[in-house]
Amino acid sequence: MSIAGDRTVAPWLDDSQFPFVSKFANVDGGRMHYVDDGQGEPVIFVHGFPTWSFMWRGLIRDLSTKHRCIAMDHIGFGLSDKPARWSYTPEAHARNFKKLLDHIGLSTFSLVVHDFGGPIALSYAIDNPGRINRICVVNSFLWSLKNDTSFQKFDHRMHGPMGKLALTATNTGLSHLVHGMVEQKQKVAGKVYPQYTGPFSKASDRHGAHVLAQGYIGSSTWLYDLWVRRESLAQKPLQVLWGMKDKLFSADHLNKWRAAWPNADVVTFPESGSLVMEEQAKEVEAAMYMFLDGHSELQSTTKALHAEF
């Protein structure tokens, strides 16, 4: 165990922004970093591409007054190990997610997922529905994207030489991706962005992100199977928080969640991109807080409030 912000471990890390104690679990590929803060009903936050547990810092700070907040970094991301030779597919990350849960030893918990964190974490939930209390989905998915035009174009870039060069040769490509995930640039302080790209300072550190980016289409068979088996989660309380100006996950993807979970609590943010927790921090925290506490009678008010933003 070490303190997050130790400059000998991650000299780029600003511990004033990420002031949490770091913990580690041994999983396939090396040491997986996670934070475990607060007491109460457990909530596990699962990031996707190309982010890490830093994205949840505000929610951890605010929700940990009533919840045990756990946020992990996939192998190859954040403060976790980044081995040169490892699979880095979403299926491999999903297996490691199970290893982390075995390490922590929770009986039941709620999930908050973003981007690829959806299928990575919900694959476990589908197989273990009795351990899941609630699910909050933030601009994420749980199905094959092989027929999705936007993701086909993205996948073509990621498999092409220029896409690989842009993502792995320097940190500039990932920096552009992160900036593109934010629509309302004025709402995110400049000091935040280097914390997202810091884990990828070396070329060798960016390999895992590149492989995962190829999984949107490359893991279509696995993703298709997850969607087919989603019925085990049909009765779970589900909240969907959606930045409507996401460059990849559109209103069509949001509507797929709505159709599959007609009773879901859906809160949209018309002017926000994928990193809605950065752009609408207070509003996201308020909506998630009420949902995790089961205050469904307040959720319609929350939706009306958010319609103003």
Which stretches of residues belong to each language-model region?
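Conserved HGGG/HGGXW glycine-rich cap/lid loop of the alpha/beta-hydrolase fold
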Residues: 36-79
